[in-house]
Amino acid sequence: MKTFHKIILPVSLGALGLIIFNSYSVRIPRGATAVKNFDTKKYLGRWYEIARFDYRFEKNMDNVTAEYSENPDGTIQVKNKGYDYLKKVWNESIGEAQFVKDPTEARLKVSFFKPIWAGYNVIDIDEDYQYALVAGRSLKYLWILSRITNIPESIRQRFLEKARKIGYDTSELIWVRHNQ
């Protein structure tokens, strides 16, 4: 019986820690609001990464795309692809996204390494679903996406202004090259 208690306590604490970590990871930055009346079907498809912060998982990457498609169970498949210009190789990661609550609110969680989830929050999008501003769980995570390899200056300024108002340091953004 004592052995059982020695095992169950650490396992329970570990499970509790994982639950707390996962709930923290899918947050949205203070001051940011996810898009309401979100249309998942219009969001699916290919997006080009226009700008991001310097993340270790995207280090030295250009020509970055994200492709979203619906899985049979209603979750969303996420396929990220980018070219490592130092190693001269293409890298691809496949993950899954799920809505945090209501699928008409653009608050999702994404995982490339289950059971670890990260916040994925569409905080601005044009009415035609051609350009999107995506926030992660904190002010360290931000992406500007487009259906084409560039973005109109008016949309760029709109997204940068919104990000600055939330508290993002937009001077740290990396503007992704698309040449392949």
Each language-model region and where it sits:
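A beta-rich soluble binding module of mature secreted/lumenal proteins
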Residues: 2-180
